[in-house]
């Protein structure tokens, strides 16, 4: 289950089938955060300007901050793929950090004053 600061939805994984959910979140000046309960798992973070081939590996509890137009996080051990893509928001600040219980947390903030939207897709396989 994924938890979102601005909105929330839940989806359960299944070994026999896959499910996908996509939602758009409006955001402006405030921070938004989400976390996943898939704790204590290693992660690989891909950072790039819409190009997932340009990747940077990271593992918890290391933190990273950068301006990106797309973010793809994969947990191979659990076969869960979470993709976050930016739509109509040219300036975005994102950070990846670890909470006390070693869950992955993503925070984002708009750097300009224009209203934008964040589109994210969560796929369970």
Curated annotation (Swiss-Prot):
The UniProt regions of compositional bias labelled Low complexity, in chain numbering, are 7-21
Q: What segment(s) does the record annotate as region Disordered?
A: 1-21
| Domain of life the protein comes from | Eukaryota
Task: Mention any additional remark.
Answer: Almost completely overlaps SEL1.
UniProt name for this protein? Putative uncharacterized protein YML012C-A
Species of origin reads Saccharomyces cerevisiae (strain ATCC 204508 / S288c)
């Amino acid at each position: 289950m994924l938890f979102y600061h601005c909105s929330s939805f839940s989806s359960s994984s299944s070994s026999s089938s896959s499910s996908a959910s996509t939602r758009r979140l409006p955001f402006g000046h405030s921070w938004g955060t989400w976390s996943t309960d898939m704790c204590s798992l290693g992660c690989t973070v891909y950072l790039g300007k819409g190009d997932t081939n340009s990747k940077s590996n990271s593992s918890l509890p290391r933190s990273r901050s950068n301006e990106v137009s797309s973010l793809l996080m994969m947990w191979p051990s659990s076969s869960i793929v979470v993709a976050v893509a930016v739509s109509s928001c040219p300036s975005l600040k994102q950070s990846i950090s670890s909470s006390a219980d070693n869950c992955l947390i993503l925070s984002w903030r708009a750097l300009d004053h224009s209203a934008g939207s964040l589109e994210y897709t969560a796929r369970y396989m």
